């Protein structure tokens, strides 16, 4: 059987390939790829985001759908939002509790083959050795800089 791993960043793709070479399945590879993508391109995904997956297991003739989207925090006060027709993207109430990590573990529990700790190995190595920051990540970090965050500190 042939496999293919595709992601927006070469290091993420290589992590997924390495998992397959080490006996992991497509789910293990997808999780490891997503974990590394969150390291090398956190502006695209990562532990602070959500996860949605449509999984097809060969021979089962049915899809599995995972919605691991975030939910509102327990202290949300909807009355404080009544003056808004839309919640501004930079408002604290626009943020949810992240669901990505919960999604990784849910997928792994049901479909994974390797140990979960093995799926983090490439990300840990990349964090330890460092990596070249892409122009996209540089721009994203520049846009959401300390100065921008300070401008909204009274909103919190």
Regions found by a protein language model. Give the residues of each.
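A short, hydrophobic C-terminal helix/tail in secreted or cell-surface proteins
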Residues: 151-156
């Amino acid at each position: 059987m042939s496999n293919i791993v595709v992601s927006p960043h070469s290091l993420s793709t290589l992590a997924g390939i390495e998992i397959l070479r080490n006996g992991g399945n497509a789910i293990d590879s997808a999780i490891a790829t997503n974990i590394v993508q969150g390291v090398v391109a956190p502006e695209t995904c990562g532990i602070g985001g959500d996860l949605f997956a449509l999984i097809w297991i060969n021979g089962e003739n049915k899809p599995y759908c995972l919605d691991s989207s975030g939910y509102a925090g327990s202290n949300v006060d909807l009355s404080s939002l009544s003056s808004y027709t839309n919640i501004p993207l930079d408002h604290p109430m626009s943020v949810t509790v992240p669901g990505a990590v919960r999604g990784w573990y849910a997928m792994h529990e049901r479909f994974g083959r390797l140990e979960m700790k093995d799926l983090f190995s490439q990300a840990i190595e990349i964090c330890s050795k460092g990596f070249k920051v892409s122009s996209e990540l540089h721009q994203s970090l520049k846009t959401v800089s300390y100065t921008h965050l300070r401008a909204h500190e009274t909103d919190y």
